[in-house]
């Protein structure tokens, strides 16, 4: 790890401060962080060590290298999605780095999942890999798919970092002096993914099963007894499901002979008890042609509840043509996962109560984004996917499940997602849902996503020309600067070649631009537009030659604000006067969409006005009698102290073809909102608590 950065988030803090200072419409929202308790914020855990797992075969062709989709750049793409969410809700997230925490592949919570043989073998293979690579030999065993999995000595450090990040995520939602000081939700951005890894067999980019390692750590450290795993990756999590069979007492094929099993390969089920609930493409890996054995297809289609200590439910993705058609699929088909997960938790509570034992639940999300509408077609060869809004809707349903059974505790672990667009947009929408906010259709538009993913280029640099009204491009560059500042190791691993080949005055490095010299522009909110001068309006309609002349006059007569080492622009009510620069890095296909920019801008302004009040509408669950009693749901709005009683008893119901009654539709929320999913789920919130989210913010 780089010793140049004592605090790995220092660069991000400074960039965030510049963002806030240059965006007066978010200053109040950022300051409001002091009034929001930690329990109401979502923790985002970054894993710098995960970057160390790099494709090591230097002798392969460039075309072959391009086929390696599980790469460090995936974390950069996720950082873009994280920063996009932070710019929208700057007071609702706490950012953590696990740079000082490396777990052990031989830790008890790893060995309980994978046994002692596989972690030891994996370490040995990584240690031997470098010598093989120097000889030009494939470093993985012949029985492995060398196109999917690669190893090097640095892979050990990456896996240690992944384990450490997982532990940090679990600690974040369970450890603290009081409930008010503990967050209820955490998203952990890690790689490589884990849900294809079996008890003793790696597969599909996965070397350890991250979800089960997290579950075992939560059980060992915080006495979690029952866990629901919700998996929305495009691919079936065959490894996660297989380990659920092991937890139920069934002998894994890879496990050595053990006398504790009976003649049928079964023994008593282990704690913690885990239910696995997945939606995936039945025609993609591991059930794609070439992998689609009869056994694999059966596994990816298993549906069994409360039998033989197993709770597994699989749903296959269907094609759709319009988002409304998808919403019908979601309500009538995919939400069945939550009904089954609810059934698992309720049965578990009843059983534990009958045994006189304490119940403690947790919801784990295997958050893969390769089912996104923005994923590359080579990954989605069978034309099934989900709209970006799905990631918000599904996550909000997961929050409700957790609120009903687990005191709101949700741990989300990044799984798949291999194109920059899929990861950026998916993480963005997922984090909006993780804070129970509404997804806005414009945020997931092609143009918005395209602008954000520009920041995933190692040699990214800001546009040299901007229109003052091009809100999307201005906002996207704010997002990019924040995202590229999140992990200092991006410089050494991803940006290195681009920086080394850049001229000395280049803007390629993800360096911080302080408020006094920042290119971060103010969002153009209505109050700014109303204060814009008539001269500015005339200016926008004048020829460029006239614009250039007037810009020179403005520079000579007014105070100027430095935008970069070479470029200056007048400091006006609305920044970024149109300027003449070379267009070597401009998007020639770009067409300014005035209506989209106006609509996008309105959504941004509306958030800054009411994000806190909307967020602090809390759902309190009051228990009557024992844990199995029905729950009374109350939603409190702190803004106006209005209290309304929700319909029903809060239980999930098996979906039907009948469209539910639609309740209040929030302004600018284009995703349909239904009475059985649109409720706030933030628990243990106190207005008296004033802990800041990372006091530096």
Curated annotation (Swiss-Prot):
CC per GO annotation: cellular bud neck; cytoplasm; nucleus; prospore membrane
Annotated catalytic residues: 196
Domain of life of the source: Eukaryota
GO biological process: chromatin organization; G1/S transition of mitotic cell cycle; positive regulation of transcription by RNA polymerase II; regulation of transcription by RNA polymerase II
Region (Disordered): 525-573, 625-697
Coarse class of the protein's main subcellular location: nucleus
Protein name: Histone deacetylase HOS3
């Amino acid at each position: 790890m780089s010793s140049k950065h004592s605090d790995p988030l220092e660069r991000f803090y400074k960039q965030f401060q510049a963002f806030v200072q240059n965006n007066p419409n978010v200053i109040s929202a950022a300051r409001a962080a002091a009034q929001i308790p930690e329990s109401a914020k979502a923790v985002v855990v970054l894993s710098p060590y995960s970057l160390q797992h790099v494709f090591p075969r230097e002798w392969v062709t460039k075309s072959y290298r391009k086929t390696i989709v599980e790469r460090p750049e995936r974390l950069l793409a996720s950082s873009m999605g994280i920063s996009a969410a932070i710019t929208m809700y700057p007071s609702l997230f706490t950012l953590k780095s696990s740079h000082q925490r490396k777990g052990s592949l031989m830790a008890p919570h790893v060995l309980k999942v994978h046994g002692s043989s596989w972690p030891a073998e994996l370490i040995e293979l990584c240690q031997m890999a470098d010598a093989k690579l120097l000889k030009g030999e494939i470093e993985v065993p012949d029985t492995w798919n060398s196109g999917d999995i690669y190893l090097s000595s640095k892979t050990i450090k990456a896996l240690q970092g992944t384990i450490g990040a997982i532990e940090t995520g679990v600690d974040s939602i369970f450890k603290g002096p009081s409930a008010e000081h503990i967050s209820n939700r955490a998203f952990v951005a890690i790689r490589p993914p884990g849900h294809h890894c079996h008890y003793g067999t790696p597969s599909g980019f996965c070397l350890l099963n991250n979800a089960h390692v997290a579950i075992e750590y939560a059980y060992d450290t915080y006495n979690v007894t029952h866990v629901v795993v919700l998996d929305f990756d495009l691919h079936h999590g065959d490894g996660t499901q297989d380990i659920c069979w092991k937890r139920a007492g069934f002998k894994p094929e890879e496990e050595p002979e053990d006398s504790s099993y009976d003649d049928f390969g079964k023994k008593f089920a282990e704690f913690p008890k885990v239910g696995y609930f997945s939606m995936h493409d039945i025609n993609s890996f591991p059930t794609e042609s070439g992998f689609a054995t009869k056994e694999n297809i059966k596994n990816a289609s298993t549906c069994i509840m409360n039998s033989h200590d197993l709770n597994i439910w699989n749903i296959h993705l269907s094609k759709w043509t319009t988002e409304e058609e998808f919403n019908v699929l979601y309500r009538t088909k995919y939400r069945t996962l939550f009904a089954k997960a609810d059934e698992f938790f309720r049965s578990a509570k009843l059983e534990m109560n009958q045994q006189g034992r304490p119940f403690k639940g947790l919801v784990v999300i295997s958050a893969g984004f390769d089912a996104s509408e923005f994923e590359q077609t080579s990954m989605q060869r069978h034309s099934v996917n989900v709209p970006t809004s799905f990631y918000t809707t599904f996550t909000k349903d997961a929050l409700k499940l957790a609120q009903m059974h687990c005191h709101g505790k949700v741990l989300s672990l990044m799984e798949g997602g291999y194109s920059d667009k899929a990861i950026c947009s998916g993480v963005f929408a997922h984090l909006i849902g993780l804070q129970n906010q509404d997804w806005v259709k414009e945020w997931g538009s092609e143009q918005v996503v395209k602008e954000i993913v520009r920041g995933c280029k190692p040699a990214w640099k800001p546009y040299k020309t901007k229109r003052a009204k091009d809100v999307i491009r201005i906002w996207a560059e704010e997002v990019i600067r924040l995202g590229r500042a999140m992990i200092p190791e991006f410089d050494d691993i991803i940006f290195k070649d681009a920086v080394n080949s850049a001229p000395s005055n280049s803007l390629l490095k993800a360096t911080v631009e302080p408020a006094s010299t920042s290119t971060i522009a103010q969002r153009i909110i209505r109050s700014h537009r109303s204060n814009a001068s008539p001269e500015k309006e005339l200016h926008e309609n004048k020829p460029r030659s006239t614009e250039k002349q007037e810009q020179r006059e403005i520079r000579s007569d007014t105070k100027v604000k430095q935008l970069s080492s070479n470029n200056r622009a007048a400091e006006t009510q609305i920044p970024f006067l149109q300027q003449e620069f070379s267009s070597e890095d401009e998007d020639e296909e770009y067409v300014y969409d005035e209506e989209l920019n106006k609509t996008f801008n309105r959504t941004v302004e509306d958030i800054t006005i009411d994000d806190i009040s909307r967020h602090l509408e809390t759902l309190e669950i009051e228990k009557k009698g024992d844990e199995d009693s029905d729950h009374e749901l109350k939603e409190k709005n702190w803004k106006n102290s209005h209290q309304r009683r929700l319909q029903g008893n809060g239980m999930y119901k098996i979906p039907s073809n009948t469209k539910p009654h639609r309740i209040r539709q929030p302004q600018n929320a284009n995703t349909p909102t239904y009475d059985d999913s649109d409720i706030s789920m933030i628990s243990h919130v106190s207005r008296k608590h004033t802990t800041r989210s990372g006091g530096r913010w």
